[in-house]
Amino acid sequence: MIILKVGGSVITRKDSEEPEIDSENLQRIASEIADASPSSIIIIHGAGSFGHPFARKYGIGSEIKDEEEFRKLRFGSAVTQSWVRKLNTHICDALLDEGIPAVSMPPSAFIRAENGRIRGADLSMIESYLKEGMVPVSYGDVVLDLNPSVRFSVISGDQLINHFSIRLRPERVILGTDVDGVYTRNP
């Protein structure tokens, strides 16, 4: 099994005022994955311009000081989740267009955090989809946080890679970024 991480900066336009897909890159990446035709793969993507601006705007992961701040955070968490789901839908659709049986796996449905770090995750559905020959597609997302003074946290695609790698033991992890080169050691 392979875990492929596609950075949000590769598939979205970070300099855009509004969330915007880099359609050319997304199509190319989906085509390259189809051409490689891996037998078992999990794809994780970053949020890029679909997540980061909203998470910052609403202070997701920050300590909550009062009820008004909590209402703002709760709403902002829902807004951020909505935008990253839209990005995930675009990515799954591009993969489907290439004949890849992609299935969305929103982290908010199977992960809990504590102080912004993954505390628990039920990966059984991901494992089941892999056994059926499907391609789980997960992403950086807003999840519930067990810390009562935080309540919601951002779990990054990088955290997902680490957690999935420890639990699922892939043969290979591939990182796709907008930086040229190949890492031979941890940067």
Named regions from a protein language model:
Residues 59-142:
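Ligand-binding beta-strand-loop-alpha-helix segment within the catalytic cores
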Residues 48-64:
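Glycine-rich loop at the start of a catalytic domain that most often binds anionic cofactors/ligands
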Residues 27-30, 118-124, 152-164:
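Active-site glycine-rich loop that binds ribose-phosphate moieties when present
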Residues 3-7, 44-45, 105-106, 137-139, ...:
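Short beta-strand segments
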Residues 164-187:
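Acidic, metal-binding active-site segment of PIN/NYN-like and related structure-specific nucleases
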Residues 35-36, 94-98, 163-171:
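Alpha-helix C-terminal capping segments
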Residues 131, 137-145, 179-187:
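Active-site rim beta-loop-alpha module in soluble metabolic enzymes
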Residues 1-42:
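N-terminal glycine-/serine-/threonine-rich phosphate-binding loop
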